[in-house]
Amino acid sequence: MQHWNAIQRLHGRYSKEVNDVLKPKGLSKSQFDLLMTLYHQESATQKSLERTLELSSGAISQTVKKLLAEHLVIRKRINREKRVLLTEQGTKLIQTSAPEIEEIDDRYFRAFTSKDHETFDQLLHKMQSDHF
């Protein structure tokens, strides 16, 4: 129980810091994550976004609708597939927001050695594969 409480406190603190960066830009964390995914993949189907982000089809659909309304993404048919792509405005927003989020991430892991990172990754993988 002690570990879960520590994880919850850490997650709460991290989430607050991330939201403090994203909120003034009009973004939620799930919107940011979707935009980052598109930034790295160029385009994606809603189904692939569901798998990558581990969100329900309804959550992805709502997030995409909000981002469409803000002109941060567009839908486009490519090779018979409906895909979601970043707009120029979406790309610029990610390019300015991502470094701020990376700075927060770096602060949380600054004290880790490379061995610590490796061990941490192994433990997370073990927890996920054993229980999910």
Question: Which residues does each PLM region occupy?
Answer:
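Active-site phosphate/pyrophosphate-handling residues
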Residues: 2-5, 33, 48, 118
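Alpha-helical linker/hinge and terminal dimerization helices associated
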Residues: 7-10, 14, 53, 93, ...
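Donor nucleotide-sugar binding loop of glycosyltransferases
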Residues: 56-57, 80
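N-terminal leader segment of winged-helix/HTH proteins
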Residues: 1-25, 83, 92
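Charged, amphipathic alpha-helical coiled-coil/dimerization segments
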Residues: 65-122
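Exposed, interaction-prone assembly regions rather than primary DNA-binding/catalytic cores
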Residues: 118-132
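N-terminal helix-turn-helix DNA-binding core of bacterial DNA-binding proteins
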Residues: 12, 16-56
